Design a protein with these regions (language model features):
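Mature, structured domains of secreted/extracytosolic soluble proteins
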Residues: 25-200
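Terminal low-complexity, poorly structured segments
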Residues: 6-12, 39, 114
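Low-complexity, disordered terminal segments
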Residues: 1-3, 86
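N-terminal chloroplast transit peptides
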Residues: 1, 8-28
């Protein structure tokens, strides 16, 4: 009889559960995250693409595709500060070469990184990756040539938002990084005004 009473109580509780929850207060929606970091602040803390061990890691017990660390944007941040390129005054899209892109430029091209070169990486207004499919006017007065190749958007020979495709040593480059005064698109190449003479 006692077990029957327990079963009856359980059945009653289960029957009343939907009625009780029907009158429970609805959870408040989560507040939208406020974007309150400037382009400069975001650039200083933004993690870049993966750096893989490659063949150098094999002798150390690493697979070639193991991640060794992450690229970053220290050299770009330092160059902007040194050359006095201030991006705090409006909404901009910054095409941001990572440190590896600066190293490649210094080793293979060698032209100085001037304010004019840096402004060639800046477009007025917030432009998402999808909006960069047409030629773009830059802050230095030049024009970046846009084209589509290998199902990717390119500007002057730089891929916008390069993403890894499968289990390989290809890296993911940050794209559409929102800031309170603009947006950052990481690129794998330092852009030089007037240097691009390739395809559209």
């Amino acid at each position: 009889a006692q077990s029957l009473t327990k079963m009856a109580k359980l059945a009653l509780a289960l029957a009343l559960a939907p009625a009780v929850t029907a009158f429970a207060p609805v959870a408040a929606p989560k507040a939208a995250t406020k974007v309150d970091a400037s382009i400069a602040d975001t650039l200083a803390t933004m993690e870049g693409p993966e750096i893989f061990w490659g063949s150098d890691g094999v002798l150390l017990g690493h697979d070639e595709a193991d991640i060794k660390g992450y690229d970053n944007f220290d050299q770009l941040a330092a160059a902007l500060s040194k050359e006095g390129v201030d991006l705090s005054g409006g909404e901009y899209t910054l095409l941001a070469p990572a440190n590896s892109a600066f190293d490649k430029h210094n080793n293979e091209v060698g032209t100085p990184i001037t304010a004019d070169v840096l402004k060639y990486h800046v477009i007025e207004g917030k432009k998402t990756m999808d909006a960069l499919n047409t030629d773009q006017k830059t802050l230095n007065g030049g024009t970046l040539t846009a084209y589509r190749k290998f199902r990717k958007n390119w500007l002057d020979g730089a891929i916008i938002g390069l993403k890894s495709e499968g289990p390989s040593k290809s890296s993911n480059w940050p794209s559409d990084v929102e800031c309170d005064n603009g947006i950052i698109q990481a690129i794998d190449t330092v852009l030089v005004p007037g240097a691009y003479a390739g395809e559209r």
